[in-house]
């Protein structure tokens, strides 16, 4: 993003625990950089035994409609919980599109695992 501090984008998948897969997102996510997140989300949706997908977005600096689409795709499986606190820019996008109203969100990864 022009004019903002660059944070290296990273998508980490934590080991599954009790049927919960945690995907940790760091950095900026747009159409050109969404590939690793798309792969991690697809693998989580397709994995046998994964009953909940926790998306940790606490370190997301920027997200565009591409990431929003990914969130909605997982949300439709009925297994998504977003771990926050949700960063301001992503929160704005979720509010603008009214996705936040239907998106289960927890304060941190451990709280999301427990839902």
List where the protein language model places each region.
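STAS-typified acidic loop motif
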Residues: 2-42, 59
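Short acidic-hydrophobic, aromatic-tinged amphipathic segments that line or gate anion-handling sites
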Residues: 101-111
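Amphipathic alpha-helical interaction surfaces in cytosolic regulatory modules
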Residues: 31-103
């Amino acid at each position: 993003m022009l004019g903002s501090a660059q944070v290296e984008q990273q998508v980490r998948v934590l080991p599954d625990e009790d049927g919960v897969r945690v995907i940790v997102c760091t950095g900026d996510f747009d159409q050109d950089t969404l590939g690793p997140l798309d792969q991690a989300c697809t693998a989580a949706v397709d994995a046998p035994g994964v009953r909940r997908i926790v998306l940790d977005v606490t370190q997301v600096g920027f997200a565009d409609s591409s990431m929003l689409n990914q969130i909605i795709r997982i949300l439709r499986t009925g297994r998504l919980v977003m771990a926050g606190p949700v960063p301001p820019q992503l929160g704005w996008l979720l509010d603008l599109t009214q996705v936040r109203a239907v998106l289960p969100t927890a304060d941190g990864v451990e709280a999301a695992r427990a839902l």
